Structure formats: structure tokens, C-alpha cells
Curated annotation (Swiss-Prot):
InterPro entries: Cardiolipin_synth_Firmi, Cardiolipin_synthase, CLS_N, PLD-like_dom, PLipase_D/transphosphatidylase. It is an enzyme of class 2 (transferase). SUPFAM superfamilies: Phospholipase D/nuclease. This is Cardiolipin synthase. It comes from the Bacteria. GO terms for cellular component: plasma membrane.
Length: 482
């Protein structure tokens, strides 16, 4: 055996040893561990390199700084709400909200998600309407504008928005942008040059410190938030790009869900932005000043909690909220997600609901955004059909909405998909809503989408080719790490 062969054997042995040690020492879900072991076994050496880039868990180093929040009373308010709910003394403004005390308590304890009850909420399901409203609010801003988007393209929509931001920065407003370094990888830094010259500040989230290599590549900031003057906020699924206006030939009409909020829930969005900004920026840190949390009384009646989650979290807060909602369902569960790859706990909760006679309807796209992810999605959908759940394929473009509506009484809207990535790897943010009128609008939007969909029946699903079945099997096997 030659020297090269000896070296190859040694490399293979080292690959297996270090791979096994690394994977098993990191605390992770069993299914993800097995998926990575398959990659490391069948793609030696290169598999370990892939693991180092995509598979490593975040270090124990604190990512977000919670200091300073005592200035605006967040910890005190959270503790007070927890105690009042525990003692059954919380002043719920709506009897319907009181019915969901357990879910509210869960999100308070897990995430410190304060319940606010004075919110005016406007629903957007079309990109043109959402961005027209956002740009109008930015035009009317008087003090500050804070934006965080996973994708910020330098196309027609991106330029339209940027021109307004440049002008507001030149007027002396405090304007800050966070974009995800991976999601916005095609956007050149020069796109922000005039904005920065005018006084605006921009930061990428988790950029690579080494050319072509990013050991935090797998951990992305998937949040989409806009906060204007501390009293108007936007949260939902729309990124910034022409495809979100239906301009993509591949996807066609883009169906998404976004909310405009005026009320105290905006405080939670502002807090989330400040934490993300201070994590992404080594300079120009934001303090919890009164200017970012103006005193006002919202005129709405929508009760809601803003819930964040990420790989730094002890608990998977958004997923836990989903499961709690599903377990509470008595009549209906309407779910939309472009990627439906639930873990065992979430899948089991949905199955039990369907088997218990709850009308479970899941809506997924009719075309792949990511090929492997789509085949895993159709495989899980096929399994869910066996329990009596109904699967609908959106056939009017691309469905990107991430919504869950239960019994026409509670709902969740935000950035988190129903998949492993959103629950374990991405930094996400969702609004949990407890007001029948607003929830009814979300339910109506879902039922309207059904009219633009076709049902995936067991007979139709059985007609899949052997090649499609093979792709589904492989994608399902690797789904914990997709």
C-alpha cells in the first residue's frame, strides 16, 4: 500500500472519529444526529467540512444582550403578568382572551412575551398593498425608522424603498437597517452607500469573517420587522424584492401574510430590533431610550403577544406555541406554510387533532422553492392525509404565508415556517393573536385561498412516479438538516 493510500485511510479514520465525537457531544435532536451521521458516513472528509459549516451548534457565548431593558420595565411587566395570571387576577379586556390563559402564560414564561390589549391591526395578503402602506408610514416618520429583513434586494422595489430611506436619513431621522448576510448575499454593499452618506446605518447579521467560509452559515436571521417612531410596526412573511410583488416568472403571484400594528405590541417589536441591532453592530449601540418607546394609548382591541425564537433559545418558543394551539383545538385547524417539515412532536399533535375529529387543513405550494425541502413537504403531507387531515395545494402562484388559525379564536402570523430550520436554526418572530374579529379575517383569507387551490387526495398522491417517491424518501431522511 502506497503512502497516498495510507494517508487516505488515516484521513477516513480521523473523519469518523472526529465526526462521531463532534456530533454526539453536541446536544441536539436524535433525528438530526442520525441525519448528520449519514452525511458524514457516505460523504467522508467533505461531509465533515459540510458539517463544520452547516451543522455545528452555536457556541454558548451569549448572542443577545438583555441589559438595559429594566429602564422600560420589561422584566417587571413580565413578572407582574405572570403572577397575575397565576393568581387568576389578570384584567383581560376580552372574555375570549381569558379562555386562552394557558397559552398566554406559556409564552410569557418561555419568552417573556408580554400580552398587550390595545392594538389596531391591519392585514395584508398582497405585496403591493403592504409596501405601499409601509412606504407611506416611512414617509410620515418623525423620529426614527428601524428595519430588519432577511432579504433586501437591490431591484426595483428595493431601490424604491431605499430612495425614501435615503431622504429620511438626510432629513436627520435615525434610520437603521439590518439585513441577513446570507439571505441578502446578492445585494452589494454599494447599494447602501448613499444611504450611509446621508447618515443612515446598516448592518449585516452574521456575516462571514473569512472569505468564502462562514461557520455560522446555517444560523440565519429570518425576521421581518419594521418599526416607525415606536408606535407603528410591521411583522409577517414579506421580504424586500420584486418577486414579493409577483414579478417572478418562476413563482408568479406571491401570496403572503403581513400585519401592520399600532399599539403596545410595537414595544416588543422595538425591543427585538434593539437586541438584534446590538448583536450585529459593534458600534452605534442602541440604548433603551424613551424616544424608542413613546407613551401613547392604542385605540384598538386586539390582544397579542410578540414571540421570538432562535438557536440561542432554551426553548423552541414558537413551536411550543403552535403545539399548545393545536392541542387546544376543538373544531378547526387551518395551517399555511411553504415548507411543511414538522418534527415528531408537532406532527404528532396535528395527527392527534385530526384523529380526534378536528377539521385539519394544511395548505402548501404547488411548486418548489427548494427542491429537497419541497419533496420532504409532500412526503409529510402524504403521511398526514392518512389521519383524515385535508391537504390543499395552492395553485394561484406561490404561497409563502406562515399562518396558523385555530377554532376561529386564536392565530399566529409571522416568519416561522413549519419546519426544523425555523424551530431550531433560524432567528424568527411571530405574533400570537387573541381577538375574534382579527382572527376571523385570517380565517376568511385562508378559505379564500382554498378557492384557488386543489385538494391533494390519497388517489392523486398514489400516482407519484417511482422517481418522485425516491426523492421524497431521501428528502424525508435528510429533513432534520435541510
Amino acid at each position: 500500500m502506497g503512502l497516498l493510500a495510507y494517508l487516505l485511510v488515516i484521513l477516513l479514520i480521523l473523519n469518523v472519529f472526529f465526526a462521531a465525537v463532534t456530533v454526539f457531544l453536541e446536544r441536539r435532536d436524535t433525528s438530526a444526529t442520525w441525519a448528520w451521521l449519514l452525511v458524514l458516513t457516505f460523504v467522508p472528509i467533505f461531509g465533515f467540512i459540510i458539517y463544520l459549516i452547516f451543522g455545528r451548534k452555536l457556541s454558548g457565548k451569549k448572542i443577545f444582550d438583555w441589559k438595559g431593558q429594566e429602564k422600560i420595565g420589561i422584566q417587571e411587566s413580565t413578572a407582574n403578568q405572570i403572577e397575575m395570571i397565576r393568581q387568576k387576577e389578570f384584567p383581560f379586556s376580552d372574555p375570549n382572551v381569558k379562555k386562552h390563559r394557558d397559552l398566554i402564560y406559556l409564552l410569557l414564561v418561555n419568552d417573556g412575551a408580554i400580552l398587550t390589549q390595545d392594538n389596531e391591526v391591519e392585514l395584508f395578503v398582497d405585496g403591493h398593498e403592504k409596501f405601499d402602506a409601509l412606504i407611506a408610514d416611512i414617509e410620515n416618520a418623525k423620529d426614527h425608522i428601524h428595519l430588519i429583513y432577511y432579504i433586501f434586494h437591490s431591484d426595483e422595489l428595493g431601490n424604491r424603498l431605499m430612495r425614501v430611506l435615503e431622504r429620511k436619513a438626510a432629513e436627520g431621522l435615525n434610520v437603521k437597517i439590518i439585513y441577513d448576510a446570507m439571505g441578502s448575499r446578492t445585494t452589494k454593499k454599494s447599494f447602501f452607500r448613499t444611504f450611509q452618506k446621508n447618515g443612515g446605518l446598516v448592518r449585516p447579521f452574521f456575516p462571514s469573517k473569512l472569505p468564502l467560509i462562514n461557520f455560522r452559515l446555517n444560523y440565519r436571521n429570518h425576521r421581518k420587522l419594521a418599526i416607525i417612531d415606536g408606535d407603528v410596526g410591521y411583522i409577517g412573511g414579506f421580504n424586500i424584492g420584486d418577486e414579493y410583488l409577483g414579478a417572478s416568472k418562476k413563482f408568479g403571484y406571491w401570496r403572503d401574510t403581513h400585519l401592520r400594528v399600532h399599539g403596545k405590541a410595537v414595544y416588543a417589536m422595538q425591543t427585538r430590533f434593539i437586541m438584534d441591532w446590538n448583536s450585529a453592530s459593534s458600534t452605534h449601540k442602541i440604548d433603551y431610550k424613551a424616544r424608542y418607546f413613546p407613551t401613547f394609548h392604542g385605540k384598538g382591541h386586539t390582544s397579542m403577544q410578540i414571540v421570538s425564537s432562535g438557536p440561542d433559545s432554551e426553548w423552541q418558543q414558537i413551536k411550543n406555541g403552535y403545539i399548545k394551539m393545536i392541542n387546544a383545538a376543538k373544531k378547526t385547524i387551518y395551517l399555511q406554510s411553504p415548507y411543511f417539515i414538522p418534527d415528531a412532536s408537532l406532527l404528532e399533535a396535528i395527527k392527534i387533532a385530526a384523529l380526534s375529529g378536528v377539521d385539519v387543513r394544511v395548505m402548501i405550494p404547488n411548486k418548489p422553492d427548494h427542491a429537497f425541502v419541497y419533496r420532504a413537504t409532500t412526503n409529510y403531507a402524504g403521511e398526514l392525509m392518512e389521519t383524515g387531515a385535508k391537504i390543499f395545494i395552492y395553485d394561484n402562484g406561490f404561497i409563502h404565508a406562515k399562518t396558523l388559525v385555530v377554532d376561529g379564536e386564536i392565530a399566529s402570523v409571522g416568519t416561522a415556517n413549519m419546519d426544523f430550520r425555523s424551530f431550531r436554526l433560524n432567528f424568527e418572530v411571530n405574533a400570537f393573536i387573541y381577538e375574534k374579529q382579527m382572527v376571523q379575517k385570517l380565517e376568511d383569507a385562508f378559505l379564500e385561498d382554498i378557492l384557488k387551490s386543489y385538494q391533494l387526495t390519497p388517489e392523486l398522491y398514489a400516482k407519484r412516479s417511482l422517481w418522485i417517491k425516491f426523492k421524497e424518501a431521501v428528502s424525508r431522511l435528510l429533513s432534520p438538516i435541510l
